[in-house]
């Protein structure tokens, strides 16, 4: 019956140029349940939730709350109905404090004067009640990603929202923060709050959700009770075929040393200390070496130094026998280094460029793409079309698609196509599957293993311990800017890695 559901989205259709993002989708949310929304990137999950939150207006369909039809024209309407949303990319003002961000738009006032003490009291009470401890006076720019997510959750609670939407909430969190978030969700459920949980991680769905609705290519595939299903069945519903959840790869056959890092140190001006300290290791042709660790332990700074985004303070980096320590990014690329960056929006793509222009960002100066100083658009499109077909990059208007309009998974596929097609000697893959669904993850893992099998040296940087254990031939753990241990994935455990990642243990001697 209709009164069983706190929210009903009935026959929702939402279109964008060249694509039907939601095609006659129905979703029904019960009071006090955690309802997961699962689907490949581009399946329409975030679009559907954006309709519920008033960011988009549907072409067809209706939304009901407690059985009554409602109009949600904007996020203010959604908040008035008790609907809140934590977006995958947080909507925070970096130069504002935590407190100012939480109360922004709903500041309490009396006779036109801001009642900040009253707001602080309410925020701290919510913080204490739900275990979401924050420093109300800290600037957003100075706090961790995990802490920023707490601020987003407190924004919803401050507005007395009872229907909470989480869009890929664990995509940017460490394993410890993920466990913490799962507990917070369970606490919300006990209080009778209803949660819509967009995720691509099947383990999380099985751990915290009561039911799951699956979308595929904008269409409704069904809703299942979690207690009656399996990860394999959910994967099949999501991608329309059996998905290999384990990486199938033969033992590595390492060859020559391709990357040799010697005593690299990088100083952080922001934190006034060394972010990377005396790091040394090698990566051979035909092997995948993973740099594992909790976020914020020097991995990002090290990759910046390795790829030329920042200068190292001391040490030496050699690529296939050539000293590249002081080379430019372009020269490192010419020497055979490819880079799949951690932040695809910041360092991987120009979002307002077309897909074809993004495909040649690192090659447009080559003779095949220009003549007399002018870009040969026909050759650029021909090359882009080839990569789109070869790597199954899906977009509304093919090579002419503006990259900003593409799903995260397809943006990542475009970067991987561009970087692998350079036939590199060294592939630096940083969080290559962050925020992606199982279908895209399976695809990307296959591509990385195929590169290794071709004889490419692969340096993988990942926070995902399942990915680390499945893909790596060797694992290096980084803690506070140092390599504290080297492991064989066949003889170690996630628990052992966790101790080294947390700084509880350290091997006496680093090995190459």
Q: Could you say what each language-model-derived stretch is?
A:
Residues 2-512:
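Glycine-rich phosphate-binding loops of nucleotide-dependent enzymes
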